[in-house]
Design a protein with these regions (language model features):
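Glycine-rich/acidic phosphate-handling loop/turn and adjacent ATP-lid/helix
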Residues: 64-95, 137
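Conserved, well-folded catalytic cores of nucleic-acid-processing
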Residues: 20, 33-37, 85-89, 112, ...
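Bergerat-fold GHKL ATPase/HATPase_c domain
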Residues: 1-52, 76-79, 83
């Protein structure tokens, strides 16, 4: 039996994902992720659960940078979940009061902000870098949705 290709064209998918979000809201999605990361790390002080955490934003005409200390992305989450579009694990974080709901905020923000992104994550003793650039966007081949860590 033959098969028909039914995967989305990447450019179409990205345009649909970002068409209804303003740039400021995309940045707020990234800050939501910082808040969720701090929640996952756990409060150091129950009365002030975000004490000691920060998210610094740097914006220039040619670049946007957010630097935080909110826990990073665990490698297994990056490999299997964080860069997927939408939640695959509905019960993940069910016991936490996280802000994120749909699993698209970071990706939508990255695509809204521009065509070149370098994401560096440090979680516990592990760290990795992910690059999403024009070459990745233009690759609609069978492995086109994969990202190198």
């Amino acid at each position: 039996m033959s098969k028909a290709l039914a995967s989305p064209a990447k450019r179409f998918f990205v345009e649909m994902l970002t068409r209804d979000i303003e740039l400021a809201d995309a940045i707020l999605d990234l800050l939501d992720n910082c808040v969720d990361g701090a929640i996952r790390v756990g409060p150091k002080d129950a009365a002030l659960p975000y004490k000691g955490f920060h998210a610094h934003i740097e914006l220039t005409p040619s670049a946007f940078k957010i630097d935080d200390n909110c826990g990073g992305i665990p490698r297994n989450i990056a490999e299997n979940y964080a860069f997927r579009f939408g939640r695959t694990e509905r019960d993940r974080d069910a016991n936490l009061a996280t802000v994120g709901v749909y699993g698209i905020g970071m990706k939508r923000a990255i695509f809204k902000l521009g065509t070149n992104c370098v994401l560096e994550s440090k979680h516990a003793a592990d760290q990795f870098t992910v690059t999403i650039d024009k070459a990745w966007m233009e690759n609609d081949g069978p492995d086109g949705w994969e990202l190198e860590l």
